């Protein structure tokens, strides 16, 4: 996944435990049981809107539960943030399970979302990391174009693009070397005629609207896809894989933080449906709200902070 797939009584429990500590004279024994005594959770995010929202959701929920959190936003691509967590610069970040399997472990995409999660978790555990629960929503790379272009070319699936003599396809620079992007499109679908256009600061949707590209790498939770103006071609060969989000966390930090840590994170993940993520992505990307404000509103609405 290149970019792009937010939602306690724990706060009350923390307040109660704090009250007990005060009644007991603020004993050291009581204080060591509080989440605040756990190691600092160093959260990192990749370099796109959805990751900023996810990072804020986990950050704010953990802070509300009493954990100390350090936040490092916009680290970069999957490869860069993977280096950050394996080097110990961060110890937690949200990742897409298919990206772990295909782009980091360099394995073939499994045939189901559950198998993809299992393979991703097994890979991370060989490196001193692990995965917490995955989200209901998935956000995979997708082959997007203007609906008018799709109709003109007579295409509904990615495989149909084989009959198009030549076309341009835009994506982030790392798309060029990814199995879940241009490499897969060429090897699996045989789209060797595709001319790659690397994205810099301009949106793929802007390039589509201006007629500067034929198609581009979009994401299934992009708010723009709610408009009939754009069409996503069906990925019949599953090049883009299964891309549910699962927090990657250091095994040492997970053990030291105690069971409450995983409970808080998993409770947030469980609420992150496709409609919820599309709405939050829209609030940030189109309505120009900040990820922090959007995340706070979602957590409050779902009683997670």
Range-by-range predicted roles:
Residues 30-42, 62-63, 159-168, 300-305:
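Immediate post-signal peptide segment of exported/extracytoplasmic ligand-binding proteins
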Residues 58-65, 158-167, 171, 175-194, ...:
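Ligand-binding cleft/hinge of the Venus flytrap
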Residues 104-132, 210-212, 224-238:
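Ligand-binding "clamshell"
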Residues 113-169, 251, 270-274:
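A conserved helix-loop-strand patch within extracytoplasmic ligand-binding domains
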Residues 128-129, 135-142, 221-268:
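Periplasmic-binding protein-like
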């Amino acid at each position: 996944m290149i970019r792009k797939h937010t939602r306690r009584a724990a706060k009350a429990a923390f307040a109660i435990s704090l009250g007990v500590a005060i009644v007991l004279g603020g004993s050291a024994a009581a204080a060591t049981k509080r989440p605040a005594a756990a190691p600092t959770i160093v959260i990192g995010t990749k370099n796109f809107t959805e990751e900023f929202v996810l990072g804020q959701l986990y950050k704010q929920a953990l802070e509300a539960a009493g954990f100390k959190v350090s936040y490092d936003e916009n680290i970069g691509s999957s490869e860069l943030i993977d280096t950050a967590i394996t080097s110990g610069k961060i110890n937690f970040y949200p990742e897409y399970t298919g990206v772990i399997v295909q782009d980091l472990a360099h394995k073939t995409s499994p045939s189901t979302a559950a198998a993809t999660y299992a393979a991703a978790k097994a890979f991370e555990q060989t490196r001193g990391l692990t995965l917490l629960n995955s989200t209901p929503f998935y956000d995979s790379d997708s082959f997007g174009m203007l609906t008018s272009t799709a109709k003109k070319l007579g295409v509904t699936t990615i495989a149909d693009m084989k009959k198009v003599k030549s076309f341009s396809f835009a994506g982030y620079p790392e798309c060029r070397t990814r199995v879940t992007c241009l490499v897969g499109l060429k090897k699996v679908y045989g789209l060797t005629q595709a001319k790659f256009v690397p994205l810099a600061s301009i949106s793929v949707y802007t390039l589509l609207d201006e007629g500067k590209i034929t198609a581009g790498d979009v994401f299934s939770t992009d708010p723009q896809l709610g408009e009939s103006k754009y069409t996503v071609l069906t990925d019949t060969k599953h090049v883009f894989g299964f891309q549910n989000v699962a927090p990657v966390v250091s095994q040492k930090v997970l053990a030291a933080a105690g069971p409450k840590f995983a409970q808080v994170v998993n409770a947030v993940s469980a609420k992150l449906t496709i409609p919820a993520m599309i709405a939050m992505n829209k609030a940030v990307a189109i309505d120009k709200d900040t990820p922090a404000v959007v995340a706070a509103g979602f957590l409050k609405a779902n009683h997670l902070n």
